[in-house]
Amino acid sequence: MSLPSIPSFVLSGLLLICLPFSSFASATTSHISFSYAARQRMQNRARLLKQYQTHLKKQASYIVEGNAESKRALRQHNREQIKQHPEWFPAPLKASDRRWQALAENNHFLSSDHLHNITEVAIHRLEQQLGKPYVWGGTRPDKGFDCSGLVFYAYNKILEAKLPRTANEMYHYRRATIVANNDLRRGDLLFFHIHSREIADHMGVYLGDGQFIESPRTGETIRISRLAEPFWQDHFLGARRILTEETIL
């Protein structure tokens, strides 16, 4: 027995009825998929934002804004920490100490006890290296130093911002103050041009009484020299002051 044929207009009607349901189902599925993906993105963004906010809170404990008040607070905090480590400082200078006499004779008194102590820390570190060999590129007491490496080693742990590495970079360092030849103070950096008239390719640290400590050249050892010697006078470029109340820890 054959099935009755379905009129074409009935088939057309059924097709029109089914198509909306099919489109609706497809759209619903797509909408669900889109909503899930959107929620996932939002959750991921929220998680990343929370992680970033946590990171900022941790950073806040040691990030210092660039205003004078916060910098003063940081220096005071650092000084309190330094007080807890007296072993960082050399023995106090006695009235008979030649180094104190040099300061008194030159009438170049430091502006505070803290600045004086910090300066002596640097000088003490420098003098501990006397007799050690010159090593080009050296920055370590167990290996040796070149001229700027010696200063880099002795000064960077007591400064808010690290010094650059080479003598010429230190000579042009913006945080350093230009010092007149008749105003030299213990701890000032001295610069010389040995191989060029325009570039600072050697340096030392002024100790007072016309003396400075230096790591001279290959084959020599770290020593104390006199600035008044003709060789140094002929090659002297100038002095810079990096140890001040504003630059030290």
From Swiss-Prot:
<keyword id="KW-0472">Membrane</keyword>
<keyword id="KW-0732">Signal</keyword>
<dbReference type="GO" id="GO:0006508">
    <property type="term" value="P:proteolysis"/>
</dbReference>
<feature type="domain" description="NlpC/P60">
    <location>
        <begin position="116"/>
        <end position="243"/>
    </location>
</feature>
<feature type="active site">
    <location>
        <position position="214"/>
    </location>
</feature>
<comment type="similarity">
    <text>Belongs to the peptidase C40 family.</text>
</comment>
<dbReference type="InterPro" id="IPR038765">
    <property type="entry name" value="Papain-like_cys_pep_sf"/>
</dbReference>
<dbReference type="GO" id="GO:0005886">
    <property type="term" value="C:plasma membrane"/>
</dbReference>
<feature type="lipid moiety-binding region" description="S-diacylglycerol cysteine">
    <location>
        <position position="18"/>
    </location>
</feature>
<keyword id="KW-0449">Lipoprotein</keyword>
<dbReference type="InterPro" id="IPR051202">
    <property type="entry name" value="Peptidase_C40"/>
</dbReference>
<keyword id="KW-0378">Hydrolase</keyword>
<feature type="active site" description="Nucleophile">
    <location>
        <position position="147"/>
    </location>
</feature>
<feature type="active site" description="Proton acceptor">
    <location>
        <position position="202"/>
    </location>
</feature>
<feature type="signal peptide">
    <location>
        <begin position="1"/>
        <end position="17"/>
    </location>
</feature>
<keyword id="KW-0788">Thiol protease</keyword>
<dbReference type="Pfam" id="PF00877">
    <property type="entry name" value="NLPC_P60"/>
</dbReference>
<keyword id="KW-1003">Cell membrane</keyword>
<feature type="lipid moiety-binding region" description="N-palmitoyl cysteine">
    <location>
        <position position="18"/>
    </location>
</feature>
<dbReference type="GO" id="GO:0004175">
    <property type="term" value="F:endopeptidase activity"/>
</dbReference>
<keyword id="KW-0645">Protease</keyword>
<keyword id="KW-0564">Palmitate</keyword>
<protein>
    <recommendedName>
        <fullName>Probable endopeptidase YafL</fullName>
        <ecNumber>3.4.-.-</ecNumber>
    </recommendedName>
</protein>
<dbReference type="GO" id="GO:0000270">
    <property type="term" value="P:peptidoglycan metabolic process"/>
</dbReference>
<dbReference type="GO" id="GO:0008234">
    <property type="term" value="F:cysteine-type peptidase activity"/>
</dbReference>
<dbReference type="InterPro" id="IPR000064">
    <property type="entry name" value="NLP_P60_dom"/>
</dbReference>
